[in-house]
Design a protein with these regions (language model features):
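Short, contiguous clusters of charged residues that form electrostatic/catalytic patches at enzyme active sites
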Residues: 45-48, 150, 197-204, 225-228
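Short, well-ordered secondary-structure micro-motifs
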Residues: 77, 180-183, 225, 254-256
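Active-site acidic carboxylates
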Residues: 1-170, 207-208, 232, 236-243, ...
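Short, surface-exposed loop/turn motifs that are enriched in glycine and acidic residues
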Residues: 137-142, 192-195, 216-220
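Histidine/lysine/aspartate-rich catalytic loop segments that bind and position anionic ligands
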Residues: 154-204
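Glycine-rich anion-binding loop/nest that anchors nucleotide
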Residues: 209-227, 231, 243-249
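Short, catalytically relevant binding-site loops at active-site mouths
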Residues: 71-73, 174-178, 219-221, 250-251
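Conserved residues at the C-terminal ends of beta-strands
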Residues: 67, 173, 215
Length: 289
């Protein structure tokens, strides 16, 4: 009997991939080469392995879901939102705490955003998952960096055409007032924006699968946050359905320890960890069923 095998690709986007020169594009306006905004070391190789897995055994996959980090240029986690005490720009990779804002070390550029910003930081820090990080502008809506890695896009397109079906796309991150690492819900859900709240239909879709293979970027952030939220809202007896494809995921540099701790905790809870080569036989068998 054919099994329901689901591939979840988390943010397989150009801005997160350390792609070689031939994958880059030239901006026709500036005539400059457009480079990834937040390249994760190893991500290009991860994408090639994912693409190969789909190309070789895609007929064994019942479903593919692709999450897309999706931001406006003006966003609470982008430099354009912030200034320092002297009114100067805030550099990417700056961590900003609620106390920093209360002390005036960093401030939102728009004064009328102060109260909401403080409330957000208070809620974020109370959750204990992340501090606010100012990232370079990335995955901006409409940009090359927002697009899916070329090899993954091509193999997913072939999978869609061969089966007359769609690879479901999940948009996250377009609310500029909250960070949205997880595809399940934002770090601080906005009560006025359902897109930031728990995506129960997505959880239910995953729960209906016999196996869920998880891959993408980055292991220290969006893969971690998404998987943790899935685990939180899954039946505890079903966690072995989840399989992290360890050679198709890489962490952001400097966050390797957090990624390692995440893998250890997931294993402890019953989530499986495997390589693409190790799951290939199951997909091929399902393809033939």
């Amino acid at each position: 009997m054919k099994r329901n095998l689901h591939l979840l690709l988390i943010d397989p986007q150009n801005d997160f991939c350390d792609v070689p020169e031939e994958y880059l594009m030239t901006d026709p306006v500036s005539q400059k080469v457009v480079a990834p905004a937040l390249p994760v070391a190893g991500a290009h190789a991860d994408m090639l392995r994912i693409a190969e897995l789909i190309a070789r055994a895609g007929a064994g996959l019942s479903d593919i879901s692709i999450t897309l980090d999706t931001h406006h240029r003006y966003d609470i986690a982008h430099p354009s939102f912030w200034m320092d005490a002297d009114g100067k720009p805030v550099a990417p990779f700056t961590i900003i705490s609620r106390q920093d804002v209360r002390d005036g070390r960093y401030l939102p550029r728009q004064p009328d955003s102060l109260v909401r910003t403080l409330a957000y930081l208070e809620s974020l820090e109370a959750n204990g998952r992340y501090q606010l990080m100012v990232w370079p502008v990335h995955c901006e809506i409409g940009s090359w960096g927002h697009n899916v890695h070329a090899d993954v896009r091509a193999t997913c397109a072939s999978w869609e055409e061969a089966g007359s079906r769609i690879a479901m796309k999940l948009i996250k991150g377009s609310n500029p007032w909250t960070e949205h690492y997880s595809a399940v819900m934002a770090e601080v859900p906005d009560p006025q924006d359902p897109a930031t709240q728990l995506n129960r239909s997505f959880i239910d879709r995953l729960a209906s699968a016999d196996q869920i293979y998880i891959a993408g970027e980055a292991g220290s952030h969006c893969v971690k946050a998404t998987t943790e939220h899935i685990v939180e809202h899954f039946d505890r007896t079903q966690l072995s359905k989840l399989v992290l494809l360890s050679d198709c995921i890489s962490p952001v540099a400097g966050f390797e320890t957090q990624y390692g701790s995440f893998l250890s905790e997931m294993q402890r809870l019953g989530v499986q960890i495997a390589t693409a080569a190790e799951v290939l036989p199951d997909l091929l068998a399902n393809q033939a069923a």
